[in-house]
Amino acid sequence: MHTGQIIQLLAGFYDVLTEDHKIVRTRARGNFRNQKTSPLVGDMVDFKESENDTGYITKIHTRENELVRPPLANIDQAVIVTAATEPSFSANLLDRQLVALAEKHIEAILYFSKTDLLSPTEFQDLQKIAGYYQKIGYQVIFPISSQPDADLIELKESFKNQLTIFMGQTGAGKSTLLNRIDSKLNIATGEVSQALNRGKHTTRKVSLIPIEDGLVADTPGFSTYAVFEMADTQLKEYFIDFKKLSQNCRFRECLHLNEPGCAVKAAVEDGSVLSSRYANYEQFIELIRNQKPEYKRKGYQKKDRRKKK
């Protein structure tokens, strides 16, 4: 019996990286279908090797976390590639991504791409926004043309012993950035459609690539997230700046909406919290509250209303 981590799924085969850095091509046993589960890229698995050089996965280890889109497991950190322009910067999308990652216990690294395309005024405005996210505790990489390699050095230092994903709005430059990190990757890139201001999807498969003593996934770009599957009372826990300030709220269960003595609202009013952060928080609360019930819960079975013969 051997143990390793799935680094690629392609045409029904799972490539597993072993502890001695050997890659073994495997298939999943049929019993996983009976368990209503299947291996994901990033899974730690046990497998048996066979004589025809194709192994068989026998066990999937307990996952630390997982994403549905893209289908990945055991992610340590995510580099959110946020376009400064083309497509336009979206604080709403960035905050959605940060909440989604925090809910999955995935550390976030903010990378602002295409900063060289901004005017001096636009550059300064976005740099202030980036500075706020850095101040509240996020690792932020904001490329400066006078220091062309500083961003890559900082990124590479963060990869060691981590499973890292790259995510962000379509056309933000995830694949372009990975090509800069390691030219041998030769990942396809696409231009942004001028008509739709949306990038063409260029990444076709889910795989993990060994880089700087870590594993990096290049994942399909996407620009929206489903409504968060959480109670409205939970959302405040994933706004790290709000969480720190809430200790000074008059009420312990303050939702930072209409309650008197709210430290978060006071911070928004005096400018120490970005107004866009609070506006996004209010919008996300409404999205959660207006979410339709999910009836396909575990254990739920639709009644058969057909008449028995």
Swiss-Prot record:
It is found in: Cytoplasm. Coiled coil: none annotated. InterPro entries: G_CP_dom (IPR030378), NA-bd_OB-fold (IPR012340), P-loop_NTPase (IPR027417), Ribosome_biogen_GTPase_RsgA (IPR004881), RsgA_GTPase_dom (IPR010914), RsgA_N (IPR031944). GO terms for cellular component: cytoplasm. One of its GO terms (biological process) is ribosomal small subunit biogenesis. Gene3D superfamilies: Nucleic acid-binding proteins (2.40.50.140), P-loop containing nucleotide triphosphate hydrolases (3.40.50.300), Probable gtpase engc, domain 3 (1.10.40.50). Zn(2+) binds at C249, C254, H256, C262. The keyword Hydrolase applies. It holds the Pfam family RsgA_GTPase. HAMAP family: GTPase_RsgA. Monomer. Associates with 30S ribosomal subunit, binds 16S rRNA. This is Small ribosomal subunit biogenesis GTPase RsgA. The lineage of its organism: Bacteria, Bacillati, Bacillota, Bacilli, Lactobacillales.
